[in-house]
Amino acid sequence: MLIRGRAIVYGDKIDTDVIIPAKYLVYTDPAILGQHAMEPIDPEFPKKAKGAILVAGRAFGMGSSREQAAIALKGAGVLAVVAESFARIFYRNAINVGLPVLQAPGVRAKVREGDELEVDLTGGVVRNLTTGEAIQGKPLAGLPLEILKAGGLLQYLKNRA
């Protein structure tokens, strides 16, 4: 499963309160949530997110277990999130809502804002097409990959019914 897009880069410990502030949790529409994604640290994020790959450092998605964090990123048009490490609950929520995620230690230091990336989920490789570098991450396989291919957990379950 290959995903291509330009990089939007953030640092370590981006928590779910930053990804989608609590005051917007009253909304359920992914597009509305997406308009407010990353608002506390990057008010321009919604303009940059469509067709982008979000790259981050360690502990991306830490904090509360709000599913809306992954929904907001997907609603903003993010194609995938690649981080050095993830909070496990965010990682599972992302897969469950159909937002591709890949853990790739060292990725943050090798990608700059605007670089063109290709993410191979099954091989676990992030290719920086701008610099020619490849970063080996942890490949996705088994049920998590099948859920992503289906478009999320609900669609996966519907397909099996």
Curated annotation (Swiss-Prot):
Describe which pathway this protein belongs to, using the record's wording. Amino-acid biosynthesis; L-leucine biosynthesis; L-leucine from 3-methyl-2-oxobutanoate: step 2/4
The job of this chain, per UniProt, is described as: Catalyzes the isomerization between 2-isopropylmalate and 3-isopropylmalate, via the formation of 2-isopropylmaleate.
Give the multimer and partner information. Heterodimer of LeuC and LeuD.
Arranged from A to Z, the UniProt key words for this protein are: Amino-acid biosynthesis, Branched-chain amino acid biosynthesis, Leucine biosynthesis, Lyase
For this chain, the family text in UniProt reads:
Belongs to the LeuD family. LeuD type 2 subfamily.
Q: Which Pfam families match?
A: Aconitase_C (PF00694)
Instruction: State what protein this is by name.
Output: 3-isopropylmalate dehydratase small subunit
Q: What is one Gene Ontology biological process annotated in the Swiss-Prot or TrEMBL record?
A: L-leucine biosynthetic process
Q: InterPro entries attached here?
A: Aconitase/3IPM_dehydase_swvl (IPR015928), AconitaseA/IPMdHydase_ssu_swvl (IPR000573), IPMI_Swivel (IPR033940), LeuD (IPR050075), LeuD_type2/HacB/DmdB (IPR011827)
Cite the GO molecular-function annotations of the record: 3-isopropylmalate dehydratase activity
Q: Which reaction does it catalyse?
A: (2R,3S)-3-isopropylmalate = (2S)-2-isopropylmalate
This entry's Enzyme Commission designation comes to: 4.2.1.33
Q: Which domain of life is it from?
A: Archaea
